């Protein structure tokens, strides 16, 4: 068996995103970014997960906002055409419990959300007050 042929058959394009360091400028609404506060539709409802943290405490916690990717900004790099060509992809994860997703009880500890509407209609929204500061990620622009 020629492993190179096998790997070539399953090889897919990857899009590598890098973030700006020490960028204090405010980013326009609808721009791709890591952390900070997400730009979401007005009817967006924050995601929560009930799980046990490392200290053994079980409670409902808001998921941390990890990133938003403006699909129009990255479509030129999507050589395989797998991503939507417009809209916004959001990534959320519950950082207090840090579930891997292997256990069925982990369901809901991570979310990918897709908004297929007009990104100019998005609203910058604060993370929930119940999200502890240590789980709020600093904003970094994508370069």
Where on the chain are the PLM-derived regions?
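Aromatic- and glycine-enriched beta-alpha-beta binding-site module
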Residues: 63-127
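Structured catalytic cores of large enzymes
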Residues: 130-131
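Conserved small/polar residues in nucleotide/adenosyl-binding loops
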Residues: 142-143
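An N-terminus-focused feature that recognizes amino-terminal "leader" regions
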Residues: 1-88
């Amino acid at each position: 068996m020629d492993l190179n042929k096998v790997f070539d058959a399953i090889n897919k394009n990857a899009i590598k995103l890098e973030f700006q360091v020490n960028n204090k400028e405010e980013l326009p609404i609808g721009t791709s970014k890591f952390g900070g506060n997400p730009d979401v539709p007005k009817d967006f409802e924050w995601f929560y997960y009930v799980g046990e943290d490392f200290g053994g405490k079980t409670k409902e916690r808001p998921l941390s906002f990890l990133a938003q990717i403006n699909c129009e900004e990255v479509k030129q790099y999507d050589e395989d055409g797998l991503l939507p060509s417009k809209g916004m992809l959001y990534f959320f994860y519950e950082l207090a419990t840090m579930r891997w997703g292997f256990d069925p009880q982990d369901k809901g500890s991570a979310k990918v959300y897709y908004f297929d509407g007009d990104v100019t209609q998005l609203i910058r929204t604060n993370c929930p007050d119940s999200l502890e500061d240590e789980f709020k990620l600093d904003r970094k622009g994508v370069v």
